[in-house]
Amino acid sequence: MSQDTEVDMKDVELNELEPEKQPMNAADGAAAGEKNGLVKIKVAEDETEAGVKFTGLSKEELLKVAGSPGWVRTRWALLLLFWLGWLGMLAGAVVIIVRAPRCRELPVQRWWHKGALYRIGDLQAFVGRDAGGIAGLKSHLEYLSTLKVKGLVLGPIHKNQKDEINETDLKQINPTLGSQEDFKDLLQSAKKKSIHIILDLTPNYQGQNAWFLPAQADIVATKMKEALSSWLQDGVDGFQFRDVGKLMNAPLYLAEWQNITKNLSEDRLLIAGTESSDLQQIVNILESTSDLLLTSSYLSNSTFTGERTESLVTRFLNATGSQWCSWSVSQAGLLADFIPDHLLRLYQLLLFTLPGTPVFSYGDELGLQGALPGQPAKAPLMPWNESSIFHIPRPVSLNMTVKGQNEDPGSLLTQFRRLSDLRGKERSLLHGDFHALSSSPDLFSYIRHWDQNERYLVVLNFRDSGRSARLGASNLPAGISLPASAKLLLSTDSARQSREEDTSLKLENLSLNPYEGLLLQFPFVA
């Protein structure tokens, strides 16, 4: 048998063994070669073994089972557990609400309570002698905005001929400084930056007596009432009067002017200034008029020790009671004119963290001094950059200018901005309680706290050598205590600030460098 015959026989056997693989419609001759179109049919092995399907309980059977004692008891048990759990959660919520400490009601806050005030007594010295006066001030509003100040105390800028009351017009702007339209534009621009304008209306600011002669008091009062109404209609947010100690019947006039100011809106501010550092005289002025801010030389009457500064602050707060305070070292001068250079950073920290409104003069954020060579002592030029002070015969150091300090993270300007930002957003610093801590004569330390908000600890070293602070908390009220450690937010020592910022410092033996102030933060603990 040939090889071809054997292949054919195998095909026949496969076709006989697997008929299901044959094409259903193939011709006889093509059946052997067709490989597609095959159909496989699976036949159940045993159709007779199909089981009976379970259709579940009928309605009658289900009701019978559900009504059995076992299921009834189960349902009642589950229902009882549900309601007991619900009542337990309700009771727990009530207990939490009842036992939780009550939040203190927030005090009424006006805009001058929420940040610092910035004084520009000499407009041309601030913007530059040839910078356009009031119009030039508009270009510096962005800079003031970065300082986070809430109000700008401007002037005096009204027409005043030295010691001539008839040539003094409190309603008109000195034409060398700008026009009424320039001032209205300034008001609108400042409003967009959320900066309020307070106008200084000290009448005879270029003369010997700021309020003219005592016999002319009635004439001054009449002019003042007319001017107040006029400027309020223009949109001014408040007024400042300096040297009120030289004004006859000052309490009477201040009360009258306050009524005029408040009649238009409660959101208007009145500021009085005095060169006096006598606490009783200051209190007498404050008691004459409600909601009055008073700037004075009270804090400059210091021997610059921690003990002396603490005494001044606590006596002032005790004497003024619940009345809102303001803090400055003078009614118009620069901080550096009254405070030594090595304490400027310390006093910035102090003024921003005491309860009340801090008041600064232009240049205080830089450490500007009034006695620089080539500058008038009462009105130093604002050092925007090296070329802006062309009257000085020698170059100005870069770190004395706004430009230079802007670029220095350890500068006095940077510290001012950080403190101003904290002062404006932290409730404990905005309107929190104040408690002085016992410490050594070289230190002044205190706590600011409000309800359940973050608390702040301020420690100031007035000594020219390092100190370890042992803080006594025995005089703190119930519910207030010092923690074992606190987070360092700010140090007036720029080297330490960059090295230890946001680190936790132990308070048991807190170490301070010479003339260093620390601002520390710790949380409320129920």
Curated annotation (Swiss-Prot):
GO terms for cellular component: amino acid transport complex; anchoring junction; apical plasma membrane; apical pole of neuron; basolateral plasma membrane; cell surface; lysosomal membrane; melanosome. Detected on the surface of embryonic epithelial cells in the epidermis, thymus, kidney, intestine, brain choroid plexus, and in retina. Detected in adult and embryonic brain, spleen, kidney, intestine and liver, and in adult testis (at protein level). Observed in all adult tissues tested with strongest expression in kidney, small intestine, spleen, thymus and liver. Moderate expression in brain, stomach, heart, testis, lung, skin, pancreas and skeletal muscle. In brain expressed on capillary endothelia in cerebral cortex. Phosphorylation on Ser-300 or Ser-302 and on Ser-420 by ecto-protein kinases favors heterotypic cell-cell interactions. There is a cross-link at residue 59 (Glycyl lysine isopeptide (Lys-Gly) (interchain with G-Cter in SUMO2)). It is found in: Apical cell membrane; Cell membrane; Cell junction; Lysosome membrane. It holds the Pfam family SLC3A2_N. The modification Phosphoserine is found at residues 2, 58, 300, 302, 420. One of its GO terms (molecular function) is protein heterodimerization activity. Its main location: membrane. Residues 1-75 are cytoplasmic. Changing residue 103 to S: Loss of interchain disulfide bond. No effect on guidance of SLC7A5 to the plasma membrane. Acts as a chaperone that facilitates biogenesis and trafficking of functional transporters heterodimers to the plasma membrane. Forms heterodimer with SLC7 family transporters (SLC7A5, SLC7A6, SLC7A7, SLC7A8, SLC7A10 and SLC7A11), a group of amino-acid antiporters. Heterodimers function as amino acids exchangers, the specificity of the substrate depending on the SLC7A subunit. Heterodimers SLC3A2/SLC7A6 or SLC3A2/SLC7A7 mediate the uptake of dibasic amino acids. Disulfide-linked heterodimer with a non-glycosylated light chain (SLC7A5, SLC7A6, SLC7A7, SLC7A8, SLC7A10 or SLC7A11). Interacts with TLCD3A/CT120 and ICAM1. Constitutively and specifically associates with beta-1 integrins (alpha-2/beta-1, alpha-3/beta-1, alpha-5/beta-1 and alpha-6/beta-1), but minimally with alpha-4/beta-1. Interacts with LAPTM4B; recruits SLC3A2 and SLC7A5 to lysosomes to promote leucine uptake into these organelles and is required for mTORC1 activation. This is Amino acid transporter heavy chain SLC3A2. The lineage of its organism: Eukaryota, Metazoa, Chordata, Craniata, Vertebrata. The gene is Slc3a2.
